[in-house]
Amino acid sequence: MYNSPTHLRLQAKSGWVVFELAGKKRSEVKARISIHVKGHAAISPARAPFGSIEMYSRISHAALLNFFQFVEAGLRQNGVKQLEIKHWPASYQPFQAKQVQQVLAHKLHFAVTEEVSSVIPVGASTLRMRMKPSERQKARKSEKLFSFSCCAPGEYKTMYDFIQACRTERKQSLSLSWKEMRQTISKFPDRFVFFKLANATGVAAAVIVIRVSDKIWYTFYYAHAAKYNKLSPVVHLLECIYARAASEKVKLIDLGTSMLQNKINKPLLHFKESIGAVTGPKFTFRKSYE
């Protein structure tokens, strides 16, 4: 989604350079990377959780190296002196992610920054089966107290405001304003799903899910009301989302990174692992040119 022409225009209206690796047939595209250039700086993405290269079929190590060398040469001819590539979580496509890392870090000598990313593989078993005992207990209690539902579009603003209020209570902020969020949803109405846990007294927890692809869901924003901190209803909310994802043949639920001021946010990472998430790397590659 993030590399689609529509989303690229939301990130920045102009300044995009797109490189493609063609297959044997003229119409075949084996890989593509969209890079935003402003002055002497180039970045992929301009404004999204990740950008980087999209690989549509298996590519040899040599072909991938040649492609990135072509990208570098093209950017340098246009006066680029700094390049940053924010890669997708390695868990999305482990083999391809390793290929990209080997080419950029080892062959082309990009500097590498590693973040910790957490994903939940979706399978036949319930998420509760993977949880630690303490989290299972929270899930059982929340199941008795709250009802799970998918929100109608008319509720989106209310859910956004709820999540924002929860973040404000914790002295945190959201990366997108409601205006920006609404604009993105209007362009991708089928990609956004809002879920909530609620009872007669109101909303206890909410989440905004992005369908990154047919096989991957990304929990973009989620939160629960501070008065439920001990109960942590987000645990039950996530297991409900897991069940919904399984019914739609989704393979991965991306819980995002667990970083705070460029360091691992250990309490957040512990929470994600305690509910059944698997930890992996998410790389950002940087290089300067003379």
List where the protein language model places each region.
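Short, charged beta->alpha transition segments
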Residues: 68-75, 106
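A conserved beta-strand-loop-helix scaffold within acyl/acetyltransferase catalytic domains
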Residues: 1-42, 87-228
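Well-ordered, non-membrane alpha-helical segments in soluble/globular domains
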Residues: 63-71, 98, 178
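Acidic-and-aromatic substrate-binding clefts and catalytic sites of carbohydrate-active enzymes
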Residues: 61-62, 91-97, 260-264
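Aromatic (often tryptophan-rich) hydrophobic motifs at membrane interfaces
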Residues: 32, 65-70, 187-290
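Conserved GNAT acetyl-CoA-binding A-motif
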Residues: 78-90, 246-257
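A short glycine/small-residue-enriched secondary-structure motif
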Residues: 38-54
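Short, polar/flexible loop-turn hinges at active-site or ligand-entry regions and domain interfaces
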Residues: 57-62, 125-128
